[in-house]
Design a protein with these regions (language model features):
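Membrane-interface alpha helices of multi-pass inner-membrane proteins
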Residues: 151-155, 176, 188-203, 247-251, ...
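Membrane-proximal, lumen/periplasm-facing interface regions of secretory-pathway glyco-
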Residues: 359-406, 417-419, 426, 435-437, ...
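Juxtamembrane membrane-water interface segments that cap and precede transmembrane helices
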Residues: 93-105, 263-297
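Transmembrane-helix signature of polytopic, membrane-embedded enzymes
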Residues: 42, 130-153
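Luminal/periplasmic acceptor-recognition loop/helix of membrane-associated glycosyltransferases
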Residues: 413, 430-475
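Transmembrane-helix motifs of polytopic, lipid-linked glycan transferases
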Residues: 117-137
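Membrane-interface transmembrane helices that cradle and orient dolichyl/undecaprenyl
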Residues: 172-188, 305-309
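Short hydrophobic/aromatic helix or loop-helix immediately within or flanking a transmembrane segment
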Residues: 86-113, 117
């Protein structure tokens, strides 16, 4: 675990979370490693581990692995559909190609456990980064911990082996660089480099660019409006941050797909209507859910404390808060975004908590607790067998050997969330659909899929695509219908999966 460095050597001892004043150099180094702030960081890390120690069942990861395999083996980018029989050869751009590679190499080396470890490492780094941002904002390690503890609960919405995590890691890095610039520590030259990486790991770069634009714009005005204030950039600051903004936009085009990758987030937002309206994580936030209640509580606490304490807010802080809250309310997947953005603001309002005092720190007790938590995490590290058992509950794992041996002579209609798993593990079976919804929505396939599983016109869709086999969840309306429809028989069935075959000729 990395310690949080002191913002200024002249600060009073009570504000320096990692600066014990007594002892030799070796003793001071040891005390930093087992100090109370580090203990709090380990508690946060253990909480993340507890929430995230069960599974890797994200439907996208499987086709991400196949894409990375194509890149590594052929040294060329995937530029069209290679896996389906419904949209074969259709143009497609892999907007997460760079963030797929760590998962792929870990999977090659350690299998499903490698996927879990890469996922866990990214989430831990994000949460530690949020904890650091909260401390920089509040200068109070206890306030930072309380706010970050709440953030972990919101972040669970995106726990899984997802390329999105790399995007949130880039966001944390951006916020750190912007904070430094506002505080007079100019490392803004790193921002174009950051966006050059970000555009190749995930489409969430567009959020970072919006926040960057807000940050630049907030320094173009000067004034005070009640408790809202704006401080104008100096001419040197304005020139520097403006130049970095231009270079960051230009850096977005440093990708294998050039402008296609830059336009992808806008295509998703404005053209992929079925995708947005039918995929669960794109649904509006449910305030009956625990995460919804926590988000509301964090927002309410931030606002109420700000009113009671009469603190002034900078323009960019208010706008950042509005962007985060609106995004999370509109699309539940952005709860992680809200966790990252809201935590430093809440921590700032909690800075009335007693500050950390290294003179009364219990270093040996901290060390004992840290070792106990790390040992517990190591002891309960999920095995490959445990991860595999969890996969069996959600994917047609047991059916794969049967599909490979059967030598299917016809097209297969499959569950959307199983498509990626089939792409990786049943390569002799071209899929009907998978979770790359964008390519299937453009071709009209996703609309037909919804008609089939919604029992609007299931038999007509199966006939339209000349389907011989249906591989689907055991307990679903479609499987119930086919069980009671003449012309279909069951070839295979287990606790998760049913494989139907059409009796007679295919239309």
């Amino acid at each position: 675990m990395q310690s949080i460095s002191s913002p200024a050597a002249s600060a009073p001892p009570s504000s320096l979370p990692l600066q014990p004043s007594l002892g030799s150099g070796d003793s001071r180094g040891w005390r930093k490693l087992v100090s109370f702030p580090v203990l709090l960081a380990v508690i946060l890390g253990t909480l993340v581990y507890a929430f995230d120690s069960g599974g890797i069942a994200d439907p996208d990861i499987w086709w991400h692995l196949r894409n990375a395999e194509v890149l590594v083996q052929t040294h060329s980018m995937v530029r069209s559909d290679l896996y389906s029989f419904t949209v074969p050869g259709a143009p497609w751009f892999n907007e997460s190609w760079l963030s797929e590679l760590p998962y792929y190499f870990a999977w090659q080396w350690m299998g499903t456990l490698g996927l879990f470890l890469v996922m866990l490492l990214q989430i831990e780094l994000i949460i530690f980064g949020v904890y650091g941002l909260a401390y920089l904002s509040s200068k109070n390690v206890k306030a930072a911990f309380v706010a970050s503890w709440l953030a972990v609960w919101l972040a669970t919405v995106s726990f899984g082996p997802r390329t999105l995590l790399a995007g949130w890691l880039c966001l944390v890095a951006e916020l750190f660089l912007l904070w430094q610039f506002r505080e007079g520590k100019d490392r803004s030259w790193l921002l174009p480099l950051l966006f050059a990486v970000w555009v190749n790991v995930h489409g969430s770069w567009v959020i970072g660019m919006v926040l960057f634009a807000i940050f630049i714009g907030s320094g173009l005005i000067q004034g005070t409006w009640g408790r809202l204030e704006a401080v104008r950039w100096t001419p040197a600051q304005r020139s520097k941050i403006g130049l970095m903004g231009i270079l960051s936009v230009a850096a977005l085009f440093l990708n294998p797909y050039t402008y296609h990758l830059v336009f992808f987030p806008f295509d998703l937002g404005f053209r992929q209507k079925l995708n947005i309206s039918h995929i669960e994580e794109w649904q509006s936030l449910d305030f009956h859910d625990l995460r919804g209640k926590i988000l509301f509580g964090m927002l309410a606490a931030t606002i109420i404390l700000a009113l009671v304490r009469k603190r002034r807010w900078r323009v960019e802080e208010v706008l950042f808060l509005l962007v985060a809250f609106y995004s999370a309310m509109t699309y539940s997947r952005f709860l992680f975004l809200a966790a990252i953005m809201l935590t430093p603001l809440l921590a700032k309002e909690l800075d009335f908590l007693p500050p950390y005092n290294p003179r009364i720190d219990k270093y040996w007790l901290n060390a004992l607790l840290i070792v106990a938590m790390l040992a517990g995490c190591a002891r309960y590290l999920p095995t490959r067998e445990r991860l595999q058992r969890n996969l069996v509950k959600q994917y047609p794992v047991k059916a794969i050997p049967y599909l490979q041996q059967l030598n299917l002579k016809g097209r297969v209609f499959n569950h959307c969330l199983w498509g990626g798993y089939l792409i990786l593990n049943a390569r002799n079976v071209p899929v009907f659909i998978d979770s790359r919804i964008d390519i299937y929505e453009r071709g009209g396939v996703f609309a037909d899929y919804l008609d089939a599983i919604g029992i609007v016109k299931p038999l007509e869709v199966l006939d339209k695509y000349h389907i011989r086999y249906v591989l689907f969840e055991k307990n679903s309306p479609l499987t119930y219908l086919l069980r009671h429809t003449s012309g279909w028989k069951i070839n295979y069935e287990d606790g998760t999966t049913v494989l139907f075959e059409r009796v007679g000729s295919v239309p």
